[in-house]
């Protein structure tokens, strides 16, 4: 069973990975026609439902751990365009970075990793005082955004995850995984059930008790006068004086009860030489049944001949 569970987890990994990729939001930098995967911050409204576009600015200071200096510019508040702040991870909490950017007049924040790591993380913050859109991108994506940021209106966009595609992939993944698990379970349990069913429905060939009783019997007196030997090959006990033995056509003898039980319950062959006694036993039985008919026919034929001679 552990093998089945391990196989299921191994098969499920690619589906879960693809689902995570489809669930990612994207950052689009229009100036170089590039898009980057990102993870929204963990609070409702972390990325506007219909997406948001605006001008991208590199934060000053870059770590965003103190109020950003852009607000000190004389023309900062006159620009009504949506403003994005690009901030590097580290030195302080995500919540401090977002609050500093928000208080400096930014409507969206892109935080990028400070180490070269492809795994994105979810920024966990207290949503009570935060209203800006916020996403997290990799170090590579952040360095590219930093290089090409121009502060132009509409140059950068945040697109929310495509929920429809995510649910489609989830449904396909679920049913595919269910199908694979079903196949593995069938492959695991079917042979056992087949073996049990076959064992229950396979009938052992046995002799009828009436045929067994037609086999000759004798009383054991001395092993020197009999070919039966001294020990029963079925129960492995020595013969005792006066015990009843049954003799098979192959000239092997056994205790009466032992061989009768063997032939009526377990098989039709001699336990010693495997000689099948069905043919000889049945043929002798048929011969006995046909003998009276033959004698009657012969007597009738003789009577008819004698009548004609008269």
Swiss-Prot record:
Task: Give tissue specificity per the record.
Answer: Expressed in leaves, stems, flowers and siliques.
Q: Does the keyword Ion transport apply?
A: no
Q: Which residues cross the membrane?
A: 169-189
Q: Where is the composition biased (Polar residues)?
A: 294-310
Q: Where in the cell is it found?
A: Prevacuolar compartment membrane; Protein storage vacuole membrane; Golgi apparatus membrane
Zinc finger (RING-type) positions are 232-274
**Keywords annotated in UniProt:** Disulfide bond, Glycoprotein, Golgi apparatus, Membrane, Metal-binding, Protein transport, Receptor, Signal, Transmembrane, Transmembrane helix, Transport, Vacuole, Zinc, Zinc-finger
Glycosylation is annotated at: 75
Which regions face the Cytoplasmic side of the membrane?
A: 190-310
Question: What is an example of a Pfam family matching this protein?
Answer: zf-RING_2
Q: Does the keyword Cytoplasm apply?
A: no
> How does this protein lie in the membrane?
Single-pass type I membrane protein
The chain positions of domain PA read 81-149
Chain intervals for the UniProt region annotation (Disordered): 284-310
Q: Where is the signal peptide?
A: 1-25
Q: Which InterPro entries match?
A: E3_ligase_sorting_rcpt, PA_dom_sf, PA_domain, Znf_RING, Znf_RING/FYVE/PHD, ZNRF4/RNF13/RNF167_PA
- Topology Lumenal: residue spans: 26-168
Q: Output compositional bias ranges, type Basic and acidic residues.
A: 284-293
Task: Give me the Gene Ontology terms describing cellular component.
Answer: endoplasmic reticulum; Golgi membrane; protein storage vacuole membrane
GO MF? transcription cis-regulatory region binding; zinc ion binding
Task: Provide the disulphide bond pattern.
Answer: 65-92
Q: Which GO terms describe its biological process?
A: intracellular protein transport
Q: What job does this protein perform?
A: Involved in the trafficking of vacuolar proteins. Functions probably as a sorting receptor for protein trafficking to the protein storage vacuole (PSV) by binding the C-terminal vacuolar sorting determinant (VSD) of vacuolar-sorted proteins.
Q: What is this protein called?
A: Receptor homology region, transmembrane domain- and RING domain-containing protein 1
From the UniProt record, report the name of the gene that encodes this protein. RMR1
């Amino acid at each position: 069973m552990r093998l089945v569970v391990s196989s299921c987890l191994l098969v499920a990994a690619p589906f879960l990975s693809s689902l995570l990729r489809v669930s990612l939001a994207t950052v689009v930098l229009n100036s170089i026609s590039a898009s980057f995967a990102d993870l929204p911050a963990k609070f409702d409204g972390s990325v506007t439902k219909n997406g948001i576009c605006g001008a991208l600015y590199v934060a000053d200071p870059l770590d965003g751990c103190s109020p950003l200096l852009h607000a000190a510019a004389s023309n900062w508040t006159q620009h009504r365009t949506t403003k994005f702040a690009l901030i590097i991870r580290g030195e302080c909490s995500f919540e401090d970075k977002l609050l500093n950017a928000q208080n400096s007049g930014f409507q969206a924040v892109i935080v990028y990793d400070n180490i070269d790591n492809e795994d994105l993380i979810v920024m966990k913050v207290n949503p009570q005082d935060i209203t800006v859109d916020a996403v997290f991108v990799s170090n590579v994506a952040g360095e590219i955004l930093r290089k090409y940021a121009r502060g132009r209106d509409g140059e950068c966009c945040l697109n929310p995850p495509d929920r429809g595609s995510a649910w489609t992939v989830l449904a396909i993944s679920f049913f595919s995984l269910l199908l694979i698990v079903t196949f593995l379970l069938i492959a695991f349990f079917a042979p056992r059930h087949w073996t049990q069913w076959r064992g229950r429905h396979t009938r052992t060939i046995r002799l009828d008790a009436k045929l067994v009783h037609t086999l000759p019997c004798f009383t054991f007196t001395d092993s020197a006068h009999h070919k039966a030997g001294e020990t029963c090959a079925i129960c492995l006990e020595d013969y005792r004086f006066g015990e009843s033995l049954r003799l098979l056509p192959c000239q092997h003898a056994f205790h009466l009860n032992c061989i009768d039980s063997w032939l009526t319950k377990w098989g039709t062959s001699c336990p010693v030489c495997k000689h099948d006694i069905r043919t000889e036993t049945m043929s002798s039985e048929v011969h006995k049944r046909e003998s009276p008919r033959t004698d009657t026919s012969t007597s009738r034929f003789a009577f008819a001949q004698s009548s004609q001679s008269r």
